[in-house]
Amino acid sequence: MYSIKTDHKLMPRERLIRLGPEKLSNQELLAILLRTGNKEKHVLELSAYLLSSLDSLADLKKFSLQELQRLSGIGKVKAIEIKAMLELADRIQIAGQAVADPVLSSAQVAEKMMIELGDKQQEHLVAIYLDSQNKIIEEKTIFIGTVRKSIAEPREILYYACKNMATSLIVVHNHPSGLTKPSANDYHFTEKIKRSCDYLGLICLDHIIVSKHGYYSFREKSDLF
């Protein structure tokens, strides 16, 4: 259970200024984001209440906007601010993981994409375009929804490859189920995109399936490459 601060003489904002953000508790940091409490709860009590409803801090990402609003004291505005904060934190983490050096392995790409796609509740199909030195030119989300619908036509993947004048590409998609074992459709799609790349003189380096818990690389584990 998160403790509730009883000394309100030095509020979280003042403590952050004096001590730095790393010295504040999760309760205090969340209180700064919430800004105000309500008629029933002081802002520190409200942040403690929200945190006490979680098994771990990471569970905060699992709340939908509607679920946050249903929590006592968390209205629409506060729920929106929390979701925006979580999304921004994700983007900062992703930016920090950006691959500036050459891509050297499927495991390197998989680790990056597990962070980006591991928690997604819908399937995302992403293409990573590389230059002749295996440096990333662009990472493009091609499709969100049901990957099967995108399997029929790899033309959009190839369009951006040509637009970026890429030498090679890596295709990644996630399995929200958490299981990374490829389906028959995944095999069919891999064969199709590889043939299409060969036809255009592009190199398809890999097709990687990721989840929160791991990844499957067709290059590492199948005979398609």
Swiss-Prot record:
GO terms for molecular function: metal ion binding; metallopeptidase activity. It comes from the Bacteria. InterPro entries: MPN (IPR037518), RadC_JAB (IPR025657), RuvA_2-like (IPR010994), UPF0758 (IPR001405), UPF0758_CS (IPR020891), UPF0758_N (IPR046778). Keywords: Hydrolase, Metal-binding, Metalloprotease, Protease, Zinc. Coiled coil: none annotated. The keyword Lipid metabolism does not apply. The keyword Zinc applies. PROSITE patterns: MPN (PS50249), UPF0758 (PS01302). GO terms for biological process: proteolysis. Residues 102-224 form the MPN domain. CDD domains: MPN_DUF2466. Zn(2+) binds at H173, H175, D186. A motif (JAMM motif) lies at residues 173-186. NCBIfam families: PRK00024.1, radc. Belongs to the UPF0758 family. This is UPF0758 protein SZO_09140. It comes from Streptococcus equi subsp. zooepidemicus (strain H70).
